[in-house]
Amino acid sequence: MNKPHQRVGSISNAHVGKDFEAVALEIFASRGIYLESDLKLPVGVGEHKKLHAFDLGCEEQMIIVECKCHKWTAPNDNVPSAKLTVWNEAMYYFLVAPQGYRKILFVLRDVSERRQETLAEYYVRTYGHLIPEDVEIWEVDEDGQEVVQQSFNKALHRTSR
């Protein structure tokens, strides 16, 4: 069966995501941050709350993580617009999460040769107005060896009116 939107060489996109979460767990543990999968916390606007399962997290250390293993669309380095809507959804969950939690978007570092920027850099440049100020974005290369960590600071990011 032809599956044009499935990652080449993978069983399924769900497997890609779970494998990426396992890499994230190892990277955080190597930094003394011990997380669990599917941490459920109450989220919502106002008094009405509903449990949301964050990809990774720890109630004791008050950390929540959403993992996204997305790439530029092959073969032409096109923007994966539909996938970035999922990043926007993650930003909303971070916004309505309980106060006091450290919030990390953990993403695959994928560089567009045509644009000369990573997907995360593109996201910050294009959707920076949707990123809460307390969200950190961590990019990891495909082999899990190098992590680029940045805190998002709206004062440094200018958007057009």
Report the location of each language-model feature.
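Acidic-basic catalytic patches of nuclease active cores, encompassing PD-(D/E)XK
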Residues: 1-43
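Conserved catalytic or regulatory cores that recognize and/or transform ribose-phosphate-containing ligands
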Residues: 2-4, 63, 161
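Charged, structured surface patches that assemble and position nucleic-acid processing machinery
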Residues: 10-15, 19-26, 102, 122-161
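Acidic carboxylate-rich catalytic motifs and surrounding loops in phosphoryl-/glycosyl-chemistry enzymes
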Residues: 39-41, 106-111, 138-143
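Acidic-and-aromatic substrate-binding clefts and catalytic sites of carbohydrate-active enzymes
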Residues: 42-49, 112-114
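Active-site beta-strand-loop-beta-strand hairpin of nuclease catalytic cores
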Residues: 52-70
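Catalytic cores of nucleic-acid endonucleases
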Residues: 68-126
